[in-house]
Amino acid sequence: MKISITENLSKLPLPATEKWPEGVFDIEAFKHGSMSLILFAPVGNDYQTPHSQDELYIVIEGSGVLIREGKEFPFKPGDALFVKAGEQHRFSQFEKGLKMWAVFWGKEGGEKNA
């Protein structure tokens, strides 16, 4: 199976909502079982709230800073960023044109350390 970034980008932005007043800049590109693949291409501000599953962001284009639980993690293309289920996080200081895949998986509340 192939999932196209170009095809999914063409569907963005989705209409604005109360939570995302500048429009919704993520779309589910694929789902299988508990795993979902989201294309995230924010514009303006990032209004995310904690998620119920663990997530892995893979940066395709652009740079910025992930703020996770108050700590800053600068990122650039090719980087992968992990956020545990329930953690406060958002993206800041990101370049116009930021694009990343976000992979959500596992049970509600996230995986436990082995």
Regions found by a protein language model. Give the residues of each.
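Short histidine-centered beta-strand/loop micro-motifs
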Residues: 27-29, 46-51, 68, 92-93, ...
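Short acidic-glycine-tyrosine-enriched beta hairpin
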Residues: 70-85
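A generic "binding-loop/recognition-motif" signal
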Residues: 33, 43, 71, 87, ...
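Short, conserved beta-strand element in jelly-roll/cupin
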Residues: 51-66
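Short hydrophobic/aromatic-rich beta-strand segments that constitute the beta-sheet cores
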Residues: 37-39, 66-68, 100
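A short, N-terminal "cap"/entry segment at the start of jelly-roll beta-barrel domains
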Residues: 1-39, 44-48
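Ligand-binding loop in jelly-roll beta-barrel domains
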Residues: 85-111
